[in-house]
Amino acid sequence: MSSQSHPDGLSGRDQPVELLNPARVNHMPSTVDVATALPLQVAPTAVPMDLRLDHQFSLPLEPALREQQLQQELLALKQKQQIQRQILIAEFQRQHEQLSRQHEAQLHEHIKQQQEMLAMKHQQELLEHQRKLERHRQEQELEKQHREQKLQQLKNKEKGKESAVASTEVKMKLQEFVLNKKKALAHRNLNHCISSDPRYWYGKTQHSSLDQSSPPQSGVSASYNHPVLGMYDAKDDFPLRKTASEPNLKLRSRLKQKVAERRSSPLLRRKDGPVATALKKRPLDVTDSACSSAPGSGPSSPNSSSGNVSTENGIAPTVPSAPAETSLAHRLVTREGSVAPLPLYTSPSLPNITLGLPATGPAAGAAGQQDAERLALPALQQRILFPGTHLTPYLSTSPLERDGAAAHNPLLQHMVLLEQPPTQTPLVTGLGALPLHSQSLVGADRVSPSIHKLRQHRPLGRTQSAPLPQNAQALQHLVIQQQHQQFLEKHKQQFQQQQLHLSKIISKPSEPPRQPESHPEETEEELREHQALLDEPYLDRLPGQKEPSLAGVQVKQEPIESEEEEAEATRETEPGQRPATEQELLFRQQALLLEQQRIHQLRNYQASMEAAGIPVSFGSHRPLSRAQSSPASATFPMSVQEPPTKPRFTTGLVYDTLMLKHQCTCGNTNSHPEHAGRIQSIWSRLQETGLRGKCECIRGRKATLEELQTVHSEAHTLLYGTNPLNRQKLDSSLTSVFVRLPCGGVGVDSDTIWNEVHSSGAARLAVGCVVELVFKVATGELKNGFAVVRPPGHHAEESTPMGFCYFNSVAVAAKLLQQRLNVSKILIVDWDVHHGNGTQQAFYNDPNVLYMSLHRYDDGNFFPGSGAPDEVGTGPGVGFNVNMAFTGGLEPPMGDAEYLAAFRTVVMPIANEFAPDVVLVSSGFDAVEGHPTPLGGYNLSAKCFGYLTKQLMGLAGGRLVLALEGGHDLTAICDASEACVSALLGNELEPLPEKVLHQRPNANAVHSMEKVMDIHSKYWRCLQRLSSTVGHSLIEAQKCEKEEAETVTAMASLSVGVKPAEKRSEEEPMEEEPPL
């Protein structure tokens, strides 16, 4: 057997392994099994059997060669395996690196895309922000251009066009006319109007403590004849700069002191020095003057002037409020660096309530103010002044009040227009006279603040040796401390003089006059105990006296019925008993008058101190009327009855003079429609017409913070219901709502003014008065009631004051009725011409309170913009919010016929179906004729509100309470209040004119009523049968109702023989069903 040679020494036949070519190497699997390459270790089925014969015989012949051959093959196989393994590892590494590079590239690409997207988004935001800034800038420019155009139009107005701002020529002509008319009277009577008694200089005048060493320097001297009043040229020297006997050195010294005082305020400008100096002249005392209504006005006419009304009974609010006002103004300045461009809050959908009112004219110059003040003096001659009053100019004691330096002109104009009543003899010399006239509208509680300053301490000032206060808070405490000490000392001296004078008069000849025991301090409980002496005539409580014999003289200025009754009462008195009775009555009146004056001053002083955050507690002395050491008790027993625990079951009235102190610090009420003269005029009207005497006057109180939080949020209650010291503890972001008004005062918007000291107390007092009256009516102590309160409340929302309102009085009263008395059904009727958005918000989801509002809506274009007919409530309160929204503007304006139709077709049917337990009325009278378009514009009569009140009295068993809301024309609100109170008393109302009875409602009103009825017919079935009579007049509607009632009665009288009488009545149609 031959074998061929091989390079490896092996025969080609016996070589079991062949070398791998590169192509096969590349296609080899990644894993190799070594066992397959070893013939000795492979299973027999894995390798084919070798059947060759030569091979079998060669194995035993060449064992060594075979072994060597196997070793070589195994070695070669191991080498190939290592090579393949290295190739596979290299391939794996190459692919892994390739995949890693791809992943990294993808990751970089993704990051790049994200960065590009972020860059694009940021660029878009920048562009959007730039567009907003540009748009805001354009809006500001347009608004500025618009204001400039309006101002330019006012400046370039033609003389023939109407304007609310009087031109200079008109003012000069009016002033010249008044001066010429009053020149002779002023020249003839000026010297008689000035008191020359030096005691009045120190006891009744106000001057700075810097001038304590010198007599008061008045603008005019009492010992010289004065020149005739006339016009002064602006180029001339100021006529009242100094008197002839005053040296220039003393004048310069006084001017330096006054400038130093004024410059202590950060708000005062250096340029307003002459104006402020002109206002610091000494007051002129007038001892024999009185005020009454304007000439030609009867007892129903209100005060024709809305002058500055701030206080009464000799306690001026400007003295304690000066440091507090300065504190607030200082915070306004230091927070942002300047007071001006602070944003004004606007209502939810419309601007402020007074938007569109004519602008007030510029303040007159100092010379004009001097002329107006001197013109008022002759008109006060030969008149009776109320006890404890005299005339004094308005003194600006705070920087904010100095900005409105012309604020005292309305006071003097108010005094010039007063009518001169018949002169009466004073009851007691030195005490003033008791007004016994019956035709006066302005009572003792209506006199302006500048008149109530007779026996009052001097305004507080800083002595030359006193150090300057370091901050506003230190100044406030210093002023209050000085005021407290001076007031008590002054009051003690005054009371001792009065008691000594009275003891000399009424003491018996056989008994020497005893020194009276003075009690200048009194506890709060005793003040409350004596309130009965202040609210009702003392003569009504005298035992053993007939009422007709005492109707002629009343201490609290209650109007007498007539002069004939007085004369008749005098004739009925027996001649023998007349001297003793009159003398005893005179003594009692004198003692009571002294007690009333003292209690008035203490109450007002204590209230002003508490409003400023300084509690004042008096010693627990007994009331002087019950002390045996009193001179009055030496002659006759002085019995003071406690106020009755249960009032008369009649109409209740509530009113408090502290609400008069809520007024703007500018002092100009002409620029603020909601002023103190509103409620003062109403109260005087009720007193003069005799309605007040027929009602039960209850005592009001301040609502607690917990009561206010039943409707308002805690932050809102603390911000607007606490004193300045507590407000300083709040977050500065909350107090930023206060802004500086154009008039110089402070407010939360251009309508809603804010007084740092008195506004919170007045707002809480208004709520408390309404709550007290509502609870007395709900519990059956009173029949019904009328609350003469301010500020109003139906616009105040949970956390937002607006529209003159801070706290919602009616809403708080309704919430407390639900919580404390568990009243299940309460009806709130709001007939103010503006929608009560605050009351609607408070009860929008409450099914137990039905809120019905009659207001001017004009498709949301009238303040406040809310009150659409489709606002029916939410949740369980759906259907219990009824908005009788009148649309169509003032073409024509709504009147009596439209409101009577709305009551007939919407209000009364729903109210009867609701069947309330108590009825509350937000009684705003700004829908009465006489209000300008922005404040109302409707033409309702005052009689109409009397008829609306009479209809509501048929609900809830007569438990009806009216709370004053809006209304800014004094004549309109006085007439409407008189009509409502007369209706509450059950008096017969004056009939409506025939024109109103036969007048049909206008098309706009019919459309508005049909829309409301269509919306609410799904909630109130009573509206379905009245849709056909919406357009009828009152006479036509009554005729239809009469015919329907006759038809129902006739059908009820029909009989069917087969049916028993008992079943016939059940199948007859009801009155609510339409007639067959």
Curated annotation (Swiss-Prot):
Q: What is its EC number?
A: 3.5.1.98
> Which residue stretches, if any, does this entry annotate as coiled coil?
66-169
Query: Where do we find the motif Nuclear export signal here?
Result: 1043-1076
Modification after translation is described as: Phosphorylated by CaMK4 at Ser-245, Ser-465 and Ser-629. Phosphorylation at other residues by CaMK2D is required for the interaction with 14-3-3. Phosphorylation at Ser-349, within the PxLPxI/L motif, impairs the binding of ANKRA2 but generates a high-affinity docking site for 14-3-3.
Where are residues bearing Phosphoserine located in the sequence? S209, S245, S349, S465, S562, S629, S630
Where is the stretch described as Interaction with MEF2A? 117-312
* Gene Ontology CC entries for this record: A band; actomyosin; cytoplasm; cytosol; neuromuscular junction; nuclear speck; nucleoplasm; nucleus
Q: Where is the signal peptide?
A: none
Q: Which reaction does it catalyse?
A: N(6)-acetyl-L-lysyl-[histone] + H2O = L-lysyl-[histone] + acetate
Membrane-traversing stretches: none
Q: Where is this motif: PxLPxI/L motif?
A: 348-353
- Written domain comment of the UniProt record: The nuclear export sequence mediates the shuttling between the nucleus and the cytoplasm.
What name has this protein been given in UniProt?
A: Histone deacetylase 4
Q: What is the lineage of its organism?
A: Eukaryota, Metazoa, Chordata, Craniata, Vertebrata
Q: Which gene encodes it?
A: Hdac4
